[in-house]
Amino acid sequence: MAADTPVEYIKHHLTNLTYGKLPEGYERADGSVVQEATWTFARTGQEATDMGFMAIHVDTLGWSIAMGILFLGLFRFVANRVTEGTPSGLQNLIEMTFEFVQGIVRDVFHGKNPLIAPLALTIFVWILLMNILKLIPIDYIPSIAHALGLEYFKIVPTTDPNATFGMSIGVFLLILFYSFKVKGVSGFSKELAFNPFNHWIMIPFNLLLEILALIIKPISLALRLFGNMYAGEVVFILIALLPLWIQWTLNVPWAIFHILVIPLQAFIFTVLTVVYLSAAHEDH
C-alpha cells in the first residue's frame, strides 16, 4: 500500500477515489504540468482537494449504486420465489425486515400515504447494506484496487459526507414537497409564521425558528450517520496499524460492537425520516 508512515497510511485510507477537473497550468505530484484544463483522477489527496466542489467520489458513487442494485436484486429474487410452505432462510430474513420497517411506519407515521412504507424500507436496507461494508477488513479491497492502479479506494459510502448529505437532502426535499402538497402554500406558510407563538408580533421570530428547524433536519440526519460511521472507520484503521497479535484482540470486539452499530444507524436514519414526513402530513 502506498503509505510509508502511520500518518500517510491513515490519510491514504480516508481519501476517496476522486475524479475531477484540474486547471490549466496545475503542477501534479509527479512534476508534470497540466497543459489545458482536463478531467482526470486525482493522484494525491491534495489534487482531490484542488479539484473542488464539482469533483466526483467515484468509489462512493459506485458502491452506493452497487448496494442499491443488490437490494433490488435480493428483494426481486425472493419475491419471485415466495413459497407458502416453509420459507427459506433468506425469505425469512426479508420478511422479518419488511415487517420490522412496516411496524416502524405503523407506529410513527400518522398520515395516509402508501409510498412512505416502501420509502422507509428502501432507506433502511440501503443504508444497512452500505454500512455492512465496514465489516470487510480494512486493507482487502483497497489492496486489490491498488494492484489495479487505483491509488485511493474507499468502500463504505456512509463514511463520505457526500453520500449522507445526498440522502438527507433527498429527505428534506420530500419534507418540503409533502408540506406544500398536504397543507397548501397558505397552510404551510401560516405554520411557519404562527408556530410556536400564535401572535402576529412574533412572526419574524417564528419564521427564524421554524426555518432553522427545517434546515437543521437534513444537517443532523447527515452528520449523525456520517459521524458514527466515520469514527468507526478511523478506529479500524488505527487498529490495523498495530502489531498483528494485538490487532486480533482489538479488532474482533470492535467488529462485534459494530454489528450493533451498523443496523442501529440505519434504524435511526429511517425512524427520523418517517417522523419528519409524518409531521409534513399533519394538516393543522
From Swiss-Prot:
According to the record's subunit comment, the protein's assembly and interactions are:
F-type ATPases have 2 components, CF(1) - the catalytic core - and CF(0) - the membrane proton channel. CF(1) has five subunits: alpha(3), beta(3), gamma(1), delta(1), epsilon(1). CF(0) has three main subunits: a(1), b(2) and c(9-12). The alpha and beta chains form an alternating ring which encloses part of the gamma chain. CF(1) is attached to CF(0) by a central stalk formed by the gamma and epsilon chains, while a peripheral stalk is formed by the delta and b chains.
Gene symbol here is: atpB
The terms under GO molecular function for this entry are: proton-transporting ATP synthase activity, rotational mechanism
PROSITE patterns on file: ATPASE_A
Its record classes its membrane topology as: Multi-pass membrane protein
Q: Per the record's keyword annotation, is Glycoprotein included, yes or no?
A: no
Q: Which Pfam families match?
A: ATP-synt_A
Q: Which residues cross the membrane?
A: 55-75, 116-136, 165-185, 196-216, 234-254, 255-275
Which domain of life does the protein's organism represent? Bacteria
Q: Which GO terms describe its biological process?
A: proton motive force-driven plasma membrane ATP synthesis
Location (main, coarse): membrane
Record-linked InterPro entries: ATP_syn_F0_a_bact/chloroplast, ATP_synth_F0_asu, ATP_synth_F0_asu_AS, F0_ATP_A_sf
Name used for this protein in its record:
ATP synthase subunit a
Q: Which family does it belong to?
A: Belongs to the ATPase A chain family.
Location relative to the cell: Cell inner membrane
Give the matching PANTHER family: ATP SYNTHASE SUBUNIT A, CHLOROPLASTIC
Q: What does this protein do?
A: Key component of the proton channel; it plays a direct role in the translocation of protons across the membrane.
Note whether Ion transport occurs among the keywords: yes
Mind listing the UniProt keywords for this protein, alphabetically?
Answer: ATP synthesis, Cell inner membrane, Cell membrane, CF(0), Hydrogen ion transport, Ion transport, Membrane, Transmembrane, Transmembrane helix, Transport
Q: Lineage from the top down?
A: Bacteria, Pseudomonadati, Pseudomonadota, Gammaproteobacteria, Pseudomonadales
Q: Which residues form a coiled coil?
A: none
